[in-house]
Amino acid sequence: MSLGDLGFHTVSLSGPATLYELAEIRESLLAAIAVGKDLRIDLETTGPWDLAGLQLMISATASGRRAGQAVRLVNVPRVCAEIAERSGLSNWLSSVTDTFL
């Protein structure tokens, strides 16, 4: 994890974002939210994805919002965007994403 620009704390995730990895990813995201700064989640080196991974991103943004923090996604992989599209969540994903791959 590193401090990003514009006052955001940036956490870079890598590897699979599926049901089997959620506990570890969730703990990383909760720790990042606990820093107390707006959060940028870099997803460039993540994959494969499943719906559980997308649900975790929804949960992270909601947790940040409850804590008064902005949570933004960057470098969202195409496969994640495709899952959002199939799930009817494209508009939500676009609303929290700064960049797609």
Language-model segments: which ranges?
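STAS-like cytosolic regulatory interaction modules
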Residues: 1-52, 58-101
